[in-house]
Amino acid sequence: MFWKFDLHTSSHLDTLLEREDLSLPELLDEEDVLQECKVVNRKLLDFLLQPPHLQAMVAWVTQEPPDSGEERLRYKYPSVACEILTSDVPQINDALGADESLLNRLYGFLQSTGSLNPLLASFFSKVMGILINRKTDQLVSFLRKKDDFVDLLLQHIGTSAIMDLLLRLLTCVERPQLRQDVVNWLNEEKIVQRLIEQIHPSKDENQHSNASQSLCDIIRLSREQMIQVQDSPEPDQLLATLEKQETIEQLLSNMFEGEQSQSVIVSGIQVLLTLLEPRRPRSESVTVNSFFSSVDGQLELLAQGALESTVSSVGALHALRPRLSCFHQLLLEPPKLEPLQMTWGMLAPPLGNTRLHVVKLLASALSANDAALTHELLALDVPNTMLDLFFHYVFNNFLHAQVEGCVSTMLSLGPPPDSSPETPIQNPVVKHLLQQCRLVERILTSWEENDRVQCAGGPRKGYMGHLTRVAGALVQNTEKGPNAEQLRQLLKELPSEQQEQWEAFVSGPLAETNKKNMVDLVNTHHLHSSSDDEDDRLKEFNFPEEAVLQQAFMDFQMQRMTSAFIDHFGFNDEEFGEQEESVNAPFDKTANITFSLNADDENPNANLLEICYKDRIQQFDDDEEEEDEEEAQGSGESDGEDGAWQGSQLARGARLGQPPGVRSGGSTDSEDEEEEDEEEEEDEEGIGCAARGGATPLSYPSPGPQPPGPSWTATFDPVPTDAPTSPRVSGEEELHTGPPAPQGPLSVPQGLPTQSLASPPARDALQLRSQDPTPPSAPQEATEGSKVTEPSAPCQALVSIGDLQATFHGIRSAPSSSDSATRDPSTSVPASGAHQPPQTTEGEKSPEPLGLPQSQSAQALTPPPIPNGSAPEGPASPGSQ
């Protein structure tokens, strides 16, 4: 993408390319020449694609520079030229593939008589590989014209880069038909037979190993190709040639005839092991259901693959059988090796790579379960020899792994395929292991010897882990397996003393060791999958019961944790700003989450719910009481009865811890700040009204439309009761006596003179607030000659809190007879027929209620003279003016 979208910085190559005397070495010295080539710089490509420059780059890649040359000429220029030629630029690929002279110059590199330079060989192989991949037709047709191409490849097969070129020729051809043509061409050139000829004692070790690796890669690639391409027109000719018995016999002859070479034996065994490898099942048999099937089903698929491999490698098995004695002799008489000094002592003679590969080959031959081959191996007593090596080389874990796998396979092998199912015969391999090899006796003796050495302070035997698994395989196949009945019978045939020792060993040391080995070293925490990750297609598979139980427990755990998180991390409105002192406190609470399901445990939120419930009920009670008072006003209650209503308000406020006149309910800091700001504005407006004189009317319509409602309730801000009252602004202070002025919804006492409030409001008039304003259209009743009017707002007189409280105390001390006669003693609510408050006349404007500071209330309002009773001094009501 970096090159595609031209995200590189600008280069000065364009300026350099404008020079007429620019040389190719000078251009290759630039650091960004490769980047500019990959982004298809037109000027640069035009310069590089000139025939002299292309020939020079091919010469750098294929011709070895002089030893006395500069380092740039020997290493830098060939490396940069190879990168440019293999940069996969279409113009360069076309130029190389279309010019046969350049291809001949490249091909000339293989015609060198001596050994090839490994660095130049890698450059040559890389350039040829990109041409095989991009210009397949041109290059294949060019190579097929060369009669000595295969001979030259085999001549330089000792160079790893040439071996890679042969593999590129087999793998980089994408079109199936063209690849089949290449395979047939190489098979006609007898590439397989010629590679086997390279595995000969007369060749060097590099040729042995590279030729063997080439044959192994051909086998694996051909089998892989057969699996991927089901409808191939014809079988792979190279693989068919390799699996022929004649080809394997030629390989075995090179290994054992004449002077034996360890390199030849090891290289030949690698080819034989590749031929005996079990094949993978075909792609059509590997479905989703088989992938999610049980372990037994997967083992059956593997067994089928091994069976197919045995059938397809019949030629190899037949060719191998006459040479088994030669391989067994290698185990008994290994090639001469020098003793090795190990950390635990002297090893003489070492096992060696040759005998290790022989053990691998014989174990693979036993796993093939071929009757003739197995009979020959048992006749040579190969399993017993392998067990001798197992216990002799105490610390060779490579050998221990091979012998353990071989013994476990022999114990679980079924009857040979050619045996009759009606009359199954005894498995000769199992009988050979327990009788000729004395497997049980060897296990018991080695275990006791290891215990004795460890008790003396010596090291533990290196094969003890593998020996434990061999003993476990024997016990498992005795309990369940194709040879279970035969194994139980063979164990019963053991001496009685040995039977008792085996039973004690199985129930004692072996059971304890297996119990220790089954403990998980790391406890894995499975992640819970969300519901979005669930797939209905996976529900049809039967997962193990442990996984189902684990998932159920995790679901239960997540449910409990979710409820705990909600309980601990939630905040009420009042507590949201009061976070815990420690930031980690909510997370510390999660550590205390338990999974207790005790039904008797009380929920910590129960008390909180009860408090919130009572608070809500109390608010509803307040609303109902206010509605009762409003109905009482509409039915004609008196001023004295309003005082009793205010008393109930004071009592309820004391119960709730709130000042009188404030409704029950939570308030926020923002509301308190708004009230303080409005009070400051009212102070300024009240001072302006007082400066103009006391005759200024203080009641006027509210500035906006009022919501509908039958009545309204006045609210007063909390004011200290001992605050002194201020004199009137006009300087005149009238002292009156009479019934006390009521608190709460105030009305002008009956029989007192009233003043019309129809004058328009002043510009700087005081803005009054109302909690429950009454709409202008609400009709009100008038008593004793007053007519019914529809004022725009309810009428309200404003007095100071201190005077009202003093008046209220006067009522408590000297109640009037008329008040007591008209009040219901049980509810303190005015009874029916009581004096109704006077209503406003036509044109009157009723002010909205407002809780003013005490000083402003005293200056603006004075109570009217009351004819009866002796009440304390207080400000006059506006109705008396």
Curated annotation (Swiss-Prot):
PTM annotation (Phosphothreonine): residues: 524
Family listed: Belongs to the SAPS family.
Identification of the protein by name: Serine/threonine-protein phosphatase 6 regulatory subunit 1
Entry superkingdom: Eukaryota
Complex formation: Protein phosphatase 6 (PP6) holoenzyme is proposed to be a heterotrimeric complex formed of the catalytic subunit, a SAPS domain-containing subunit (PP6R) and an ankyrin repeat-domain containing regulatory subunit (ARS). Interacts with PPP6C and NFKBIE. Interacts with ANKRD28, ANKRD44 and ANKRD52.
Subcellular location: Cytoplasm
Region annotation Interaction with PPP6C: where it falls in the sequence: 10-403
Function according to Swiss-Prot or TrEMBL: Regulatory subunit of protein phosphatase 6 (PP6). May function as a scaffolding PP6 subunit. Involved in the PP6-mediated dephosphorylation of NFKBIE opposing its degradation in response to TNF-alpha.
GO MF entry, a single one: protein phosphatase regulator activity
Segments of skewed composition (Pro residues): 700-710
